Amino acid sequence: MNTLKEIISVANSGNAEAQNQLGDAYFDGIEIEQDYTLAFEWYLRAAQQGHKEAQYN
């Protein structure tokens, strides 16, 4: 399991799976303050790269 810090780093580098995971973390408030706006932004970044799960979040 990756730490939130690692997920943030990889997501910022453009990895769609990490972006989706970060969206999940923000949506559910896992290890970070719940923020639906940021969740949407991270899901959108992943979805724009073709990440299928993110396209439905």
Feature map (PLM): residue ranges:
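Generic short amphipathic/hydrophobic targeting helices enriched at N-termini
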Residues: L4-E6, D28
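Intrinsically disordered, low-complexity repeat tracts enriched in Gly/Pro/Ser/Thr and acidic residues
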Residues: M1-N2, A11
